[in-house]
């Protein structure tokens, strides 16, 4: 439940829910599990801000354990599609698809707060009981394609080659803000708003 915000304007008092008020300042929140309805909302906000001013920066604050690959990729594809630069700030956790979104920000403008964490790993998948063997082979093939696609995105976003990414995503690979910076997924660590970030 979001608190309401009341502002005094030239037209009188105006009331907003908090995300709508943040949107006025070109701030987008990616909070919680990445799923279709959340992704639709994020994509709509990005397209709205792009239509308002395609040259002005958008700030995206991320705290997400990940979720649906297709929902997450709809967000990252939109981030790359629009002309407006998207700055990403990880607060709390970016895991799984959350890391794909966070690393898809404008290079040079991808940040973490000092106590935030990053987690990369393979996409999850599995067959439902009773699934035919041929269907299981199709699922396995699709999972391999998805893994390869996500690994390429991570390699392009970092200072690491595809072989290193593939090895590190074989199991859960946790990183602190400092480790994420050294890995190349982010460009700086923010400790105070308005102050210069810690960089390499």
From Swiss-Prot:
Broad class of enzyme this protein falls into: hydrolase
* A GO molecular-function annotation: ATP-dependent peptidase activity
Set out the biological process GO terms recorded for this chain's protein.
Answer: protein quality control for misfolded or incompletely synthesized proteins
CDD domains (UniProt xref): S14_ClpP_2
| GO cellular-component term (any) | endopeptidase Clp complex
**Which parts of the chain are coiled coil?**
none
Name of protein: ATP-dependent Clp protease proteolytic subunit
The organism encoding this protein is: Leuconostoc citreum (strain KM20)
Q: From which lineage does this chain's organism come?
A: Bacteria, Bacillati, Bacillota, Bacilli, Lactobacillales
């Amino acid at each position: 439940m979001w608190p309401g915000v009341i502002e005094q304007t030239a037209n009188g008092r105006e009331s907003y829910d908090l995300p709508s008020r943040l949107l006025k300042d070109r701030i987008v929140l990616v909070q919680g599990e990445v799923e279709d309805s959340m992704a639709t909302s994020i994509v709509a906000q990005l397209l709205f801000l792009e239509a308002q001013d395609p040259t002005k920066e958008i700030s995206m604050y991320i705290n997400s354990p990940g979720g649906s690959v297709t929902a997450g990729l709809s967000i990252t594809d939109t981030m790359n599609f629009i002309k407006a630069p998207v700055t990403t700030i990880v607060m709390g956790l970016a895991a799984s698809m959350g890391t794909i979104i966070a690393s898809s920000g404008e290079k040079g403008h991808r940040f973490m707060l000092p106590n935030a964490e990053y987690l990369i790993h393979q996409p999850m998948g599995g067959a439902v009981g009773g699934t035919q063997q041929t269907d299981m082979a199709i699922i396995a093939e699709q999972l391999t394609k998805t893994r390869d696609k996500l690994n390429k995105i991570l390699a392009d976003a970092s200072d690491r080659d595809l072989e290193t990414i593939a090895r590190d995503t074989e199991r859960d690979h946790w990183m602190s803000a400092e480790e994420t910076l050294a890995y190349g997924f982010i460009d700086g660590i923010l400790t105070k708003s308005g102050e210069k970030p810690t960089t390499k």
